[in-house]
Amino acid sequence: QTKQVALMSATRVPVKKEFLLEGANYYYSGQYGELGQKMKVGVFVEFDNKGEGLGIPLPRGVIRMYKKDSQGNAQFVGEDRIDHTPKNESVRLKLGDAFDLTADKKQTAFRKLAGTSRYNYVFESAYEIVLKNAKPEAVLVTVREPMPGDWTIVSESQPHTKAASGTAEWQVKVPAEGRATLSYRVRVMY
């Protein structure tokens, strides 16, 4: 018989919650059409290992998160594994997928602009992502697309940020019980 005992506990830890739809880089060099229906949107939380009940080195293992319901009872929200974490460092956990947020994604255009040798290919493709929110409140969804090669966003329905050399991100506000559409066209060169 195995019994699990909590090593430590912290309450009222301020967290930053993020809804994340993450793409893949394979579909920027070919023609695909539909890329996914009812795709899952990940739920992440981030907190700093400092302050009340924290601020000590955290050992590698499982962290479970609970949230109080309307009656004040702790309800299990999710869990994730962490590596050894020093004090004053941030911790990011994936709690699972949102069951009331989905996305439909499709490629709306594709063309090869150049390329006859192994490394001189230029492709241009367009995408549409429809985010659907069944929650009673509006949410902000981060759409993160890993872009291969040397890439340029040619046009977009909302401004992106270049999160890293190979990553574009959009912050899409999705209304309560509604939907929002992100469209963009990208040129990639290998």
Task: Tell me what each language-model feature is.
Residues 1-190:
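Long, intrinsically disordered, low-complexity accessory segments associated with secretion
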